[in-house]
Amino acid sequence: VHDRQVGTRLPSQPGKGYHRDIPIGPNGAPHLQIACVLNETAVFCTPLYTFVRFAGTMEFSGRNLKMRPARLRQLTESGRLFFPGLGTARPVSEWCGLRPMSVDGLPIVGPLPGVDGLTVATGHGMLGLTLAPVTGQMIADQVLTGVQGPEDLSPQRFN
């Protein structure tokens, strides 16, 4: 449900993220056993079958899905800082997508003021999948028991 459809406005903006999938092999990505974070460059590396996904960046450029080659190269260059053997294999896929970001950096989770029966969970930014289990538990607790989650995450904090 778009916030304008229910007569309220949640202060958020899109944050564009990118990923580039590099095949595993002598001229490609290393064979990683587990996912890792390249903290210095904020790039996440996830082994997925026959390739490693290099993901990250946050670009505030409105609601557009134009892929910027420099952002994609940044992912590979970050990988090379930590994996010097990362070759020049062509990526098997490249992607960008928009993540909902709240204006204060915290997720927006809880009942929407003025709209009975509507609970929202948005604004997680780069941590959407990471925070999905705990967010789901919070929503389930709120709906089933009426116990509200932290005020810091409530949509009412913007009123």
PLM regions and their residue ranges:
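C-terminal lid/capping helical subdomain adjacent to the catalytic/cofactor pocket in oxidative enzymes
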Residues: 108-159
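Active-site substrate-recognition segment that forms the wall
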Residues: 1-116
